[in-house]
Amino acid sequence: SWDEEIFQSSRLSLYKEAVIKLKESGRLYACYDTREELDLMRRRLLSAGKPPIYDRRGLHLGDAERIKLESTGRIPHWRFLLDGNPAKWGDLIRGDQEYNTNNISDPVLIREDGSYLYTLPSVVDDISCGVTHIIRGEDHVTNTAVQIQIFEALGNVKKQILFAHLPLLTDRGGDGLSKRLGSLSVKDLKESGL
């Protein structure tokens, strides 16, 4: 049961422990690509008719190459190494699911400035808070596949958590409702009597 508010800013030491574990196990690697380099790589892949999947060049850098990049002022961002195995789970809405993680890039978990993207703190918090159900929109199926691999890399058994992916809410025109676009909110629905 929920009985307290959790602030991620007070849990940074837990995230740091997870980062150390992922680095030690070889599942977190430094990348020095700039946004411009990544955009160029993405455009080249797309123009060749290939999916824009990161080529893991950061994974293959040697110590001398890393030192050289850092001496020019480059600061790494950190990517999680997906293991290429399909992520599988029983979805409470969609039934048995399998997602091929070879179809996506290794996700960035830590930005150049050292701040965390949503993915890592979310998994660490789910584990430490004993979350049992994750219910979200079906547009997050890819995130689930990634998070399952992070759960496993941190030594957590994914069966502890049940996933449910709901169809997205749409307006009458079929466009998805979005907070960012100022779409109809639950508050609006409640005020209209629904």
Language model feature labels by segment:
Residues Q8, K21-K190:
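Active-site cores that bind ATP or allylic diphosphates and position pyrophosphate for catalysis
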Residues S1, E191-L194:
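Short, intrinsically disordered, charge-balanced linker/junction segments flanking boundaries
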Residues A18:
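Conserved N-proximal alpha/beta basic substrate-recognition cap immediately N-terminal to
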